């Protein structure tokens, strides 16, 4: 009720003010004043009241003050104080319209020598009075649903399968490669897959170095070269392990290199064991003493078993480069034997 009483007192206040010299009001200012009076009436009607029927009384035609009468009363309103040089903004809470009108710049009438400064009553701010105005319709804020976060893209990586080294039943040094190996190069992102094979092999790519392919010229690699290559790979692996073993980016490559090294060592041991077995056999009686009959049987059996490929074996172009010197010695010996009369006579018997 206090805000309503204050507003009514403000409306009735100009009648109790003593008469001061009148001022000249322009039509625009008069229109702004009339609009402001209408805004005040709307504010008075929008103030909630505890008494029922209060709003009906304010809307009744018996209202004493009209817009025109209040507009005429504001023409004679003059108050002492500092003049406001800025424009005031009125906001209607119902229609949400904004009206700007000048509050200063009143020109006194011609013929008045005294200059009086006037301040409109609506520019006076009370010190200890607080007015709470409520709109007829409450403001409802629509809560917008928050956008759902996009699911994080899952990074897919090629599966990594470790090789399996199994011992053969015939020899403890021979390894068979049963499961495929799939490695992922971190720098290039290319997966390297090796299909399953039962035959021991030395070809393949490691995560540290891409060695030369052994499958192209297997006869050009002897036992010493293979062991030297394995030692080089082992030294490189040891250097890689000493450099950085805690980095998870290199851990998988190091494990793959270890597996390849184990396979290479096992294959080298199997090859060495096979060579030792061949040296002990009768096919290659090198470095051991034997009787004459055993040597004859060995040579005849070897020539008989390879008789279908003697033409290929006797061609110098098919012999590996490191064995051409020995092959030339054998070929010259055979030529000399074929030219001798003794061998020709012996061959005629057969």
Curated annotation (Swiss-Prot):
Gene Ontology CC terms, in alphabetical order: acrosomal vesicle; intercellular bridge; microtubule cytoskeleton; mitotic spindle
Superkingdom of origin = Eukaryota
What positions does the record give for glycosylation? Answer: 128
Q: Name one Pfam family in it.
A: SPESP1
Cleavable signal peptide: 1-19
Key word Signal present in the record?
yes
- Tell me where in or outside the cell this protein is found: Cytoplasmic vesicle, Secretory vesicle, Acrosome
**Which GO biological process annotations does it have?**
acrosome reaction; fertilization; fusion of sperm to egg plasma membrane involved in single fertilization; sperm-egg recognition
- Record PTM text: Glycosylated. In testis there are two predominant forms of 77- and 67-kDa and a form of 47-kDa, whereas in epididymal sperm from caput, corpus, and cauda there are two forms of 47- and 43-kDa. Testis forms contain complex carbohydrate residues. Epididymal sperm forms are N-glycosylated. Then undergoes significant glycosylation in the testis and that the majority of these glycoconjugates are removed by the time sperm reach the caput epididymis.
Report where it is expressed, by tissue: Highly expressed in testis, where it is localized in the acrosome of postmeiotic stages of spermiogenesis (round and elongating spermatids and in ejaculated spermatozoa) (at protein level). Poorly expressed in placenta and fetal lung.
| InterPro entries listed in its UniProt record | Equatorial_segment
Keywords on record: Cytoplasmic vesicle, Developmental protein, Glycoprotein, Signal
* Chief location: cytoplasm
Q: Any stretches that span the bilayer, and where are they? A: none
For this chain, the family text in UniProt reads: Belongs to the SPESP1 family.
Biological role stated in the UniProt entry: Involved in fertilization ability of sperm.
In terms of PANTHER family, this protein maps to: SPERM EQUATORIAL SEGMENT PROTEIN 1
Protein name from the UniProt record: Sperm equatorial segment protein 1
> Whose protein is this, by species?
Homo sapiens (Human)
**Taxonomic lineage per UniProt?**
Eukaryota, Metazoa, Chordata, Craniata, Vertebrata
